[in-house]
Design a protein with these regions (language model features):
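Patatin-like phospholipase
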Residues: 2-201
Length: 201
């Protein structure tokens, strides 16, 4: 939206994507080189083994390369390091550097990288490593960043909250339930503070 897509265009983009593919690390056969294709055709099942160190552990179930590629396609023309305040509509997004526990607000840089970092849900997507930072979804520190919008000059804040309510103990059964609850709890105080700054909710 910030770079000129209309609401109708964004709706169409969302509805026409193959989300099963985007939210996987599968590489299309057409993108593989000849030797990779031959390996695929030779074996019904393959299990990769490698010497892996602690530093190489990815930190998430999904590397997110396919969705990052989509972001790159959608932001064609904005691949250089740019000032997000100079976009057709000023833009910012929030991540957390888990190396320091600090909030990182992107006002500049590569748009696709900022988008990918701000959606790196811990345990689901691998963190984004950038300039000695290890970045995850900003929802862990600021899931309703009204303060960021105010600092950018917003006069009226219209907020929409799509997060789930906290679950009672008998509903916290799966790993996903527990991770989701932790993320909601981590940003709860800042959320309450920002909620009071909202004009329409």
């Amino acid at each position: 939206y910030a770079i000129g897509y209309s609401a109708e265009q964004m709706d169409s983009i969302v509805r026409t994507q193959d989300w099963t593919y985007l939210l996987s690390d599968r590489t299309p056969r057409s993108d593989k080189n000849m030797s990779e294709r031959e390996i695929d055709e030779k074996y019904v099942l393959s299990v990769p083994f490698s010497k892996i160190s602690i530093k190489e552990v990815t930190g998430g179930l999904i590397k997110g390369q396919n969705i990052y590629n989509m972001f790159n396609q959608l932001t064609l023309g904005y691949h250089d390091s740019i000032d997000f305040n100079k976009l057709p509509i000023p833009y910012a997004c929030v991540a957390e550097d888990i190396a320091t526990g600090t909030e990182v607000v992107f006002h500049s840089g590569k748009l696709a990288t900022a988008m990918r970092a701000s959606m790196a849900i811990p345990g689901v997507f691998t963190p984004v490593r950038l300039n000695n930072m290890v970045l995850v979804d900003g929802g862990t520190v600021n899931n309703y960043p009204v303060d960021v919008a105010k600092e950018m000059g917003a006069d009226i804040i219209i907020g929409i909250d799509v997060q789930n309510d906290l679950k009672p103990s008998d509903k916290l059964e799966s790993t996903g339930d527990i991770l989701g609850q932790l993320i909601n709890l981590m940003g709860k105080e800042q959320y309450k503070k920002n909620l009071n700054e909202t004009d329409t909710y």
